[in-house]
């Protein structure tokens, strides 16, 4: 896939469509490569040491998508781009805080070790080690506090978006942030079920925007 992106041509229908989209909206090849390279690195078990490593990962899997969307939306002001990066980081942090157990089952720990009160490992989390799970949950709360800072920064850039898409992006961001808020209120049930924001809560949040 990487070679085909660099060539700008592919026999695969999906990749070919993506390359057409890239040409139509003048999406930089570097963004596609950053995205693909991060997915390649993520094929293998991993654990992140610190927040900087997490931000780099989040950039690769999420911020790159936001930057590509800027091109699709016709956002040309370079001042908007850092806000798109921040929103991608924030949303990925929300995902990570929600999916610790699911990720551990896939031999991945994305909550940085620097945010964990005590060390954790995938086996301990999956097997229900109480000390490790308590540590991971506290790490998730610390991560969500950082995510909120990124959401706040991203919100400063909504004005760069065309009116036709601005509200949709604001809704998506708010609903993702609400995942973290639900995680923070779900200590007793966090490990029993995946955190989900109810339809009623989503509707309320949307009406508040």
List the predicted regions and their residue ranges.
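Catalytic cores of Mg2+-dependent Asp-rich isoprenoid enzymes
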Residues: 1-91, 97, 101-209
């Amino acid at each position: 896939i990487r070679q085909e992106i660099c060539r700008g041509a592919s026999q695969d229908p999906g990749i070919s469509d993506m390359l057409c989209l890239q040409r139509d909206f003048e999406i930089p090849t570097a963004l596609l490569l950053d995205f693909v390279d991060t997915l390649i690195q993520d094929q293998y078990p991993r654990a992140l040491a610190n927040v900087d490593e997490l931000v780099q990962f989040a950039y690769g899997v999420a911020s790159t998508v936001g930057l590509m969307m800027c091109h699709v939306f016709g956002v040309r002001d370079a001042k908007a781009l850092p806000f798109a990066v921040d929103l991608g980081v924030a949303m990925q942090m929300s995902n990570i805080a929600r999916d610790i157990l699911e990720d551990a089952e896939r031999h991945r720990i994305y909550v940085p070790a620097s945010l964990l009160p005590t060390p954790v490992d995938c086996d301990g989390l999956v097997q229900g080690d109480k000390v490790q799970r308590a540590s991971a949950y506290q790490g998730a709360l610390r991560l969500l506090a950082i995510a909120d800072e990124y959401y706040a920064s991203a919100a400063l850039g909504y004005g760069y978006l065309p009116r036709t898409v601005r509200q949709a992006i604001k809704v998506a961001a708010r609903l993702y942030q609400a995942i973290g808020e639900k995680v923070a209120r779900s200590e007793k049930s966090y490990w029993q079920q995946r955190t989900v924001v109810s339809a009623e809560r989503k509707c309320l949040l949307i009406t508040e925007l």
